[in-house]
Amino acid sequence: MERWPWPSGGAWLLVAARALIQLLRADLRLGRPLLAALALLAALDWLCQSLLPPSAALAVLAAAGWIALSRLARPQRLPVATRAVLITGCDSGFGKETAKKLDAMGFTVLATVLEMNGPGALELRACCSPRLKLLQMDLTKPADISRALEFTKAHTTSTGLWGLVNNAGHNDVVADVELSPVATFRNCMEVNFFGALELTKGLLPLLHHSRGRIVTLGSPAGEMPYPCLAAYGTSKAAMALLMDAFSCELLPWGVKVSVIQPGCFKTESVSNVSHWEQRKQLLLANLPGELRQAYGEDYIEHLHREFLHSLRLALPDLSPVVDAITDALLAARPRPRYYPGRGLGLMYFIHYYLPEGLRRRFLQSFFIIPCLPRALRPGQPGATPAPDTAQDNPNPNPDPSLVGAR
């Protein structure tokens, strides 16, 4: 097929014009991403000239160049000025690190903690400016939430409240739904959903006035059925849906809502081995005899060891999550969802596009590889035949002496 040079030249002229405008505005990221984009555009140019008529080639090349330069634009950030932000759960992890970064940027930070004299609160007092204010708050106590609302109003009379970061979260069991006490589900919902809901609703008048931001820490466990995290995951799923509702309803008020869905990061609470050991012992101590007989203590020990093994993959650098929270607060056009962390793109692709059996096996291999409960193992007294489960289970008859080994 004869090649037409004019669509190529016209498209490249449009791309060059936009690139020049972005350069003059200091709104174009230079370096390898730009070189890669130009190489891909050159390859697309050759394909378009070979396969498409002139008008279609011009349209495709111009659109591709426009999209590429849009992706390479520097994110437009709002000035910090005198903005104030309330962050919950600043005793450790994402909340503490976000409070430190926003304080260093010049924000007025209102940070809630469970313990005013705990290590996290002491660290924030030592390394942050006097602008940072600490408040003790337990999201399961309505009186604490009411006090936090009054505290926030009192400390933002001159600046207004620009943002709320719903970071505080709770999970204290890693076990099958049948083994998890109903109280665990209630506790997760109280902190991760109802407490955050009450606080958010109470702050909406201030956020209406500032046309500010709501940023909420979610979890992929709220979108994918992670093994043994049902109590935590259901509360995070409820919170994510609530934020989607807020996003639609608050749009006329100019309030923007973002949900951060982080991967596996090594926060203090997640990597606290002694805490998880205590929770396992408490679960075993309160397990009804019938369930203890059906599942076996070695089954729970296996889940515990698998969970601790999965934590070895946790990322120690929390900055991707902190950066995502910062962008959601200051970007001119914040994203509705942020996915900081390694491998999340692959996980979501598998979850949404591959068959259910493959999805389940992938999550198990990534997080907790299950074994059969005692009552389903061949050779056990009163064992229940389970041909379907045995066929799907990668480890149907584990040797108790090797439970948790890899």
Swiss-Prot record:
The keyword NAD applies. Highly expressed in the kidney. Pathway: Steroid metabolism. Coiled coil: none annotated. It comes from the Eukaryota. SUPFAM superfamilies: NAD(P)-binding Rossmann-fold domains. Residues 379-406 are annotated as: Disordered. It catalyses: an 11beta-hydroxysteroid + NAD(+) = an 11-oxosteroid + NADH + H(+); corticosterone + NAD(+) = 11-dehydrocorticosterone + NADH + H(+); cortisol + NAD(+) = cortisone + NADH + H(+); 11beta,17beta-dihydroxyandrost-4-ene-3-one + NAD(+) = 17beta-hydroxyandrost-4-ene-3,11-dione + NADH + H(+). GO terms for biological process: glucocorticoid metabolic process. PANTHER family: 11-BETA-HYDROXYSTEROID DEHYDROGENASE TYPE 2, SHORT-CHAIN DEHYDROGENASE/REDUCTASE FAMILY 9C. Interacts with ligand-free cytoplasmic NR3C2. This is 11-beta-hydroxysteroid dehydrogenase type 2. It comes from Oryctolagus cuniculus (Rabbit). The lineage of its organism: Eukaryota, Metazoa, Chordata, Craniata, Vertebrata. The gene is HSD11B2.
